[in-house]
From Swiss-Prot:
GO terms for biological process: amino acid biosynthetic process; branched-chain amino acid biosynthetic process; regulation of DNA-templated transcription. This protein activates the transcription of the IlvC gene in the presence of acetolactate or acetohydroxybutyrate. IlvY is also a negative regulator of its own expression. InterPro entries: IlvY_PBP2 (IPR037404), LysR_subst-bd (IPR005119), Tscrpt_reg_HTH_LysR (IPR000847), WH-like_DNA-bd_sf (IPR036388), WH_DNA-bd_sf (IPR036390). This is HTH-type transcriptional activator IlvY. Residues 18-37 bind DNA. It comes from Salmonella typhimurium (strain LT2 / SGSC1412 / ATCC 700720). PANTHER family: HTH-TYPE TRANSCRIPTIONAL REGULATOR, HTH-TYPE TRANSCRIPTIONAL REGULATOR ILVY.
Length: 295
């Protein structure tokens, strides 16, 4: 049984979405399906019940999840034991990311890193995702989780984690904005928009306006922080374009007040990854963190 197959299985068991897990594991959906089929053939049991959009674990799948978690943990512990025979790393590593990324992408990375380097102290700062790249460039953070800009600074190294789906969201509860967008062909030039004040998400909405030939959009507010954009949409202030993962990790009372109007096409993926200064990649702590990333 391949450890990579077990890692992929665990991600799918958590996400319950083939497309999302395929993007996160950097494989095609067909490759992901083959990995799951290989496990099912090895065990002689179906692991998932599939429908058009999601999957759910079978009883055999639940048992394999426990086995996979224990096996991968034991493997990490073995790696740690072997690493202890050599010089161990210690010190502080300063990481910056958004609140959403701290929930959605950072935990599994930190689990792997701390399993191998338990003496390293992690200093985590959260804030506006649009500031992440600048935090690395200025040295305020050793590493950051950031959306890849259209032009990556030459001094910055970027390791991709996932291509994120981008969605246009609107209020789900009755309000004037919902009435505007609920017709067959909304007049987007009159719909109020909540926009990011900077960063890749800001660039995305500008491209959206251009594609819809909106030269003078109605901007209700520009906001620092994608999480605040979701809250303003939930309050009925306008619509917003942002990564779907932000909505997925919003508090349930907020999430229930928002609906998705459309998803971006896959031709223009929103790349999320970890960045660091190229000239610092040789430093022991940053080098160790870089090596445990999926890429």
């Amino acid at each position: 049984m391949d450890l990579r197959d077990l890692k992929t299985f665990l991600h799918l068991a958590e996400s319950r979405h083939f497309g999302r897990s395929a993007r996160a594991m950097h494989v095609s959906p067909s490759t992901l399906s083959r990995q799951i089929q290989r496990l099912e053939e090895d065990l002689g049991q179906p692991l998932f019940v599939r429908d058009n959009r999601t999957v759910t674990l079978t009883e055999a799948g639940e048992e394999l999840r426990v086995f996979a978690q224990q096996t991968l943990l034991q493997y990490q512990q073995l790696r740690h034991t072997l690493d202890q025979q050599g010089p161990s790393l210690s010190g502080e590593l300063h990481i910056f990311c958004s609140v959403t990324a701290a929930y959605s992408h950072l935990p599994p990375i930190l689990d792997r890193f701390r399993a191998e380097h338990p003496s390293v102290e992690i200093k985590l700062t959260t804030g506006d995702a649009a500031d992440a790249m600048e935090k690395v460039v200025t040295g305020e953070a050793d590493l950051a989780i950031a959306g890849k800009p259209e032009t990556l600074p030459g001094a910055v190294a970027f390791s991709m984690l996932e291509n994120l789906a981008v969605v246009l969201i609107a209020p789900a509860l009755p309000c004037p904005v919902r009435n505007q967008v609920s017709v067959d062909k909304p007049d987007w030039s009159t719909v109020p928009f909540i926009m990011a004040d900077q960063g890749p998400v800001r660039r995305r909405i500008e491209l959206w306006f251009r594609r819809h030939k909106i030269s003078n959009p109605q901007i209700y507010a520009t906001v620092g922080g994608h999480e605040a954009m979701v809250s303003m949409v939930a309050l009925g202030c306008g619509v917003a374009l942002l990564p779907e993962v932000v909505l997925e990790n919003s508090p349930e009372p907020v999430r229930n007040r928002v609906m998705i109007l459309e998803r971006s096409d896959e031709k223009t993926p929103f790349e999320l990854g970890v960045c660091a200064q190229k000239k610092r990649l040789h430093e022991p702590l940053i080098d160790a963190f870089w090596k445990i990333l999926p890429n």
